[in-house]
Amino acid sequence: PQGRIFVDSGVSQYAPGPMRKYVRSSLAHNVVRVNGDEQHELWGEFRVGARGKIYEMSIVNADDISEITLRIQPHSAVRVTWCHTRIITLHPAAISILDRIEVPENSAVESSLQLHPDVTIERENSELALNREGVTVARMSVIGADTLSLEPSVYCPDFGVEIKSLWICLQQQGAGVVEMKVNIESC
C-alpha cells in the first residue's frame, strides 16, 4: 500500500474557534514545543506577532544520502529561551529525524508527528509498526524520549473536511542539551 504516513493538520476553516486555533498551532505541524510554548506568537485567527527565527538551513547530498539541517529559535515572548536544531537524514529506504533542543533550565520538551488517518500503529517491543491497509509499511524506533504516547488529532485534507487521526507524542524533561531521535525504515 502506498500513501502518506505523516502529514500536517491542514486547514479546515477560517472561522474563530478551537479548530482554527489548533490548525495554526505548533502542535499541528510536526515541530517541537518547549513548556507548551508556540514557535510563533499567534494573535487571533489570522495574525502573527513575534516570529521564530531560522538561523541555519542547509542541505548536503553525498552518494545516496541527503542531510537537511534546520535551526530555529522561537519568538521572543516565550517563557524560557531555547533553540531547536532538527537534522533529517534521508537514506534510500530510511529516514532519521534528530531533534536537539538547547534549553537553559529544566523544561518539558515535546515533539509531535502527525499521522495520516489511514495509518495504524502496533507496538512491537521497542518499535512501532506503521501500517496502511493492514500491511506494515515502515518500522519506527525512538531514542532519547522519556515517554511516547499516541494522542487524538484531526487531519484536514480539504477546507471544511475534518478526519480523526492520531499523533505520536515524544516527551523528555531536561535542561542543557535535550535530544530525541526517530528512525523510520521502510518495509
Feature-to-residue mapping (PLM):
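Beta-strand scaffold of nucleotide-dependent catalytic cores
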Residues: 6-10
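CBM-like, beta-strand-rich accessory domains located in the C-terminal region of large
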Residues: 11-187
